[in-house]
Each structure stands twice: as C-alpha cells, then as structure tokens.
C-alpha cells in the first residue's frame, strides 16, 4: 500500500508543480469552497483525510490579526465551515508555511477538540521547511488518519 501511495503522491506532485497560481484581490484565503467540497464529498470509505496547505489565513478577522487586507471581515457569507468537517469525522492535516496562520490554526484546533469525544479524528498542524518534506508528512499522516478511522469502526461494531 505504501508503494501505491508513494506513486500516487509523486504523480500529484508533478500535477501540482504544473499549476499556475494567481492571487485574489485580498491576502486572506478563500478556504470556504474547499471546506464545502470536503463536507459534500461522497467518501468511498470511512477514512476521511484532508490536507490544508496555505500561507495565509481564512477570510474573517477572527482568523488573523487586523493587519491583513481583507475583503470579507465577517467571513465568507453562506459558507460551510471547519466545524462541519470535524462533525463529519474528516481528519485534517494543516501544513504551516508561515506564522500568519497561527490564530486560524488555533481556532481550528479548538473546534476539532470539541468533537474528539464524539468521533475520534486526527487534527495536526505541521510546519515544513521544504517541499520535499511534504511528501513524507502526507504518507506518515495519511497512515495515521487510516488508523484513527479504523479505531472508530471497531469501536462502533455491535458486540
């Protein structure tokens, strides 16, 4: 399984390297669309694992200090949020690239902690120093997410 995962990750790495990235008209990230897709996704099995890589916090002044230029100071209207991801048992690995995301990741951590009694999920914040670190982190943590989900399945088996 690790060889298949490594091959898939290497293919995705090539695809990511070919993406041309452009900016919006503010510094804050519009993460709501990604969270909404994760919540709506038809997961094939009980292992639900999402990776967030961002160099800026989510829209909304509560997720960062007021120094950032922000088009949505109240947050993105009518958006799914991180709480729905935690409630659905979607594990989240946050890749920290800059300290600008500290406030946001602390809020996410507190939200996930509220749901750990209901459903065990994996929430981690990991700083990386080079793009090569990302592949190893994904392999290691996707295995952890699978183990967490298996624990949930075993816990919920009828006795």
Model-derived segments and their meaning:
Residues 1-159:
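Divalent cation-coordinating acidic motifs and surrounding scaffolds
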